Amino acid sequence: MEQKQRRFTKNVFVLDQKRKTICGQIAARQSLPYCQIKIGRNFALRAVATPEPKGYVLEICDVGAYRIQDGNDVISLMISADGVEGTQERWEEWKFESDLMRTNGHSSKYKRSVGRREIKVSKGMGIVPPYTRNDFDRRELPELPGVQRSKYDIRELRQKIREEREKGAVEQPHKPAFKTERGMNRPDSDEDQNPAGGVVNDWTCETQKRDQEAERREALEIRLADNDRESKHSNWIVRGRGKILKEVKNSFRTQEVERKKSDMGEVIIEEDDEDSEEEEGARASYITSAYIERISRIRKIKDERLSMLASMMPQQSGEYTTTLFIKKQKWDNVPLYLIDEMQKKYELQSVGSCERVAFVSKGTNLIILPVASNPR
């Protein structure tokens, strides 16, 4: 048995200040402003002083057919001078004035307590008199251009459409994808219609399966060939990137070794004993420990003029690009250089003491040259 939808009790508080309806008359007899209409499993009328929380307040000025709409909740009321009739069900044979509810907050006394509550308010104009027949028949199909009326009602029409759809779904899997040449040129013979002649259909299905299998194998071979070609292309790209990466690493390693040699703050660090011995053997005899110690001290001072330059060891002879400044300092046991400021060249003279030190740059590298006082 189908379960009926449950209807909750709704409270409508009719405010008829002109006392033209039975609701206004009931409220006037009790000297109260509102007439409560309770609609649910039962129907009741009574006069009240204030509306209940979450109730519907309908302010009217005359008799009429009112339809209260609040979301999915619909309450239809016929309010006249001598009676009230209402329902929450469909009531389409009569015309109604639609009144949309607006939620408002208020403060009122309810059950001996005063507090803030929520009510929904709407105002009816009495445009539609009660029990006005609805001339429009929803069951009648209007005459529409390009549309022909079916001889079946809506239930029979839906059943017909459902049966045709199910019949098509059942017949479709057994329908052959193609017919033989004989079947395409002329209608099916009695032999084809005979159940004993199912050999032709079996042969047709077998041929179709073989063709589908051949197409599947061909598509698989094409996919495998494409994957193989993409794999080879990817391997070629990976090998090329690996080669470039290896060259970059070698170049970076060479620059790092040169930077370690030229960085005075880290020149004392030794990676292992063998590398240290090789570097000591390869290092020129004119680069003395006193010179290295002097340069280390200069780098630790962190002069702003030298902060953007990387330290570089001077060679026996070389070139530079810019003379930064010359400082008066007395150094002992350091390589001494002759400096040609016109051609911007320097050349090693000897190892000894100096009273001036030239700070020159070559690109982004800093070269510190103790200046020889007397030429050779």
Swiss-Prot record:
Region (Disordered): 163-201
Feature: compositional bias, Basic and acidic residues: 163-188
Keyword RNA-binding listed: yes
Single Gene Ontology MF annotation: RNA binding
Keywords: RNA-binding
Family classification: Belongs to the orbivirus non-structural protein NS2 family.
Role this protein plays: Single-stranded RNA-binding protein.
Descriptive protein name: Non-structural protein NS2
Upper lineage: Viruses, Riboviria, Orthornavirae, Duplornaviricota, Resentoviricetes
